[in-house]
Amino acid sequence: MGRIIGIDLGTTNSCVAVLDGDKPRVIENAEGERTTASVVAYTQDGETLVGQPAKRQAVTNPENTLYAIKRLIGRRFEDEEVQRDLKIMPFKIVKADNGDAWVEAKGQKMAAPQVSAEILKKMKKTAEDFLGEEVTAAVITVPAYFNDAQRQATKDAGRIAGLEVKRIINEPTAAALAYGLDKKGGDRTIAVYDLGGGTFDISIIEIDEVEGEKTFEVLSTNGDTHLGGEDFDNRLINYLVEEFKKEQGMDLRNDPLAMQRLKEAAEKAKIELSSAQQTDVNLPYITADATGPKHMNIKVTRAKLESLVEDLVQRSLEPLKVALSDAGLSVSEITDIIVVGGQTRMPMVQAKVAEFFGKEPRKDVNPDEAVAVGAAVQAGVLAGDVKDVLLLDVTPLSLGIETMGGVMTKLIEKNTTIPTKANQVFSTAEDNQSAVTIHVLQGERKQSSYNKSLGQFNLEGIQAAARGMPQIEVTFDLDADGILHVSAKDKSTGKEQKITIQSSSGLSEEDIEKMVQEAEANKESDKKFEELVTARNQADQLIHGTRKQVEEAGEALPAEDKEKIEAAVSELEEARKAEDKEAIDAKVQALVAASQKLMEIAQQQAQAQQAPGGEGEQEAKQDDNVVDAEFEEVKDEKK
């Protein structure tokens, strides 16, 4: 079996790690960074950029640069959160035929898992470059509070990227694994506060150690899948837009280019204000009107930023209370607090968390890397490389079916350890009813319509009988990824229907297969593009080298050969402008053939240089008379 890698697929940044010996190691990408921006761009010349290269060109290509896609994964277009994002994202969010929230770039509609797959492909390639072998399996992390549809969509993204997703693991649980793996000395109860780019989770986890074997048991989890650093950025962006409007009377929201520049500046200002008390948002030529160009120069203090986001930080504290209550613990029973996710670097967030728990969060956990490291540990457990670690995770939300009167009847309660199985016997609501619809729900409300619909299916062929007589056994089987499999069986006839819940929205098997094939086709076209670029570079080098040699050969090169070479160079220059690698290769060979005489002359000249008494030797003799001197640099006092 090949290596299994651990991937933290984040809203703002992603990270990949692998077990290197018995220690997890975060792998640097091609740009030398330990994290990769979760940004995907589709350029005018058909290239797909991921990470920093995509981020760099965002200002000039805002409509086709996609970021924070994780906020859309597994979501319906009509969802309130999607409608909020619709107003602030510079790219198009569109409604798919199945009701999902998709995106549009360069006139093409794409599912969120398709875009996320591009980020996963980059992570896969990063790992392959480091390991020197193909990688086909991964453990991918998701927010603990992700529902079934969002987990399924993340798995789909993995498949599209060419990865077998061995396990979906909750981010706070992964962070706890990273933290607790090498900690010695007794049992601990830890709180993992995870405020990332787009999602927020809190998990209460108990770490027990018995005879060297560690058990990580999640006691409870809670969160908000639409609260994160992006929301903090948006508050600052809105403030800057309003301030500029007051000063200049112009609304920048109508200018996608200006908004993209503003997004970058706001993110930078927010980061700076974690260490400084004040910063300037200085954007010259942000826009223009009939009177000329307009510039933005607005001072932002840390206090101002804190006043803009105070309610968001406060919002993150509510799930803490619920999680503690669900775990049956008081604040004083928490031994350690771990904060992960980039947004936890904000001093105000750290202060509020410390105030809530009555103690400072630990500083020995890297908030950007802990989740990927934990995923790599779990990958090691699955591969059999890490022994003595048992992970017991939970389902974040209750699961059940709709019963008479639009009530949700729960079969699996929230915070139940997974994998788990539950069954319950139901019956018909009317006489001689021959079919029942099983409507599967996820959530905590009694009224079905307020919960998340995960899908429905029919059990047909029920024997005619008075209402309440048939016995229909519904079984919920929740796997270790937190993905649900449901079956319904008529106990009298033995007829059975089974489904793996694939939200009525989610991607069908056909869709995924098509996207996998597209990704494979793109792999081929990417390879061809790379080969074309290599051929062009070789052509450039040959042209440059040949011209230099022609110059050096001077009169020694017959005029007839010189003409042949110049013609071949011109033809190669023309060929390299086109998209045909074979044509470039052919013209390279033609230039090499035309340069035979030139090569001979160059060789003769080189030999003459090396010969005794030649120029090279004379220079060497002169060099013998050179005396090495030591110089001391004199500093200019005025500087």
From Swiss-Prot:
<dbReference type="InterPro" id="IPR043129">
    <property type="entry name" value="ATPase_NBD"/>
</dbReference>
<feature type="region of interest" description="Disordered">
    <location>
        <begin position="603"/>
        <end position="639"/>
    </location>
</feature>
<dbReference type="GO" id="GO:0140662">
    <property type="term" value="F:ATP-dependent protein folding chaperone"/>
</dbReference>
<protein>
    <recommendedName>
        <fullName>Chaperone protein DnaK 1</fullName>
    </recommendedName>
</protein>
<keyword id="KW-0143">Chaperone</keyword>
<feature type="compositionally biased region" description="Acidic residues">
    <location>
        <begin position="625"/>
        <end position="639"/>
    </location>
</feature>
<dbReference type="InterPro" id="IPR018181">
    <property type="entry name" value="Heat_shock_70_CS"/>
</dbReference>
<comment type="similarity">
    <text>Belongs to the heat shock protein 70 family.</text>
</comment>
<keyword id="KW-0597">Phosphoprotein</keyword>
<dbReference type="Pfam" id="PF00012">
    <property type="entry name" value="HSP70"/>
</dbReference>
<dbReference type="InterPro" id="IPR029047">
    <property type="entry name" value="HSP70_peptide-bd_sf"/>
</dbReference>
<dbReference type="GO" id="GO:0051082">
    <property type="term" value="F:unfolded protein binding"/>
</dbReference>
<dbReference type="InterPro" id="IPR013126">
    <property type="entry name" value="Hsp_70_fam"/>
</dbReference>
<keyword id="KW-0346">Stress response</keyword>
<keyword id="KW-0547">Nucleotide-binding</keyword>
<dbReference type="GO" id="GO:0005524">
    <property type="term" value="F:ATP binding"/>
</dbReference>
<dbReference type="InterPro" id="IPR029048">
    <property type="entry name" value="HSP70_C_sf"/>
</dbReference>
<feature type="compositionally biased region" description="Low complexity">
    <location>
        <begin position="603"/>
        <end position="612"/>
    </location>
</feature>
<comment type="function">
    <text>Acts as a chaperone.</text>
</comment>
<feature type="modified residue" description="Phosphothreonine; by autocatalysis">
    <location>
        <position position="199"/>
    </location>
</feature>
<keyword id="KW-0067">ATP-binding</keyword>
<dbReference type="InterPro" id="IPR012725">
    <property type="entry name" value="Chaperone_DnaK"/>
</dbReference>
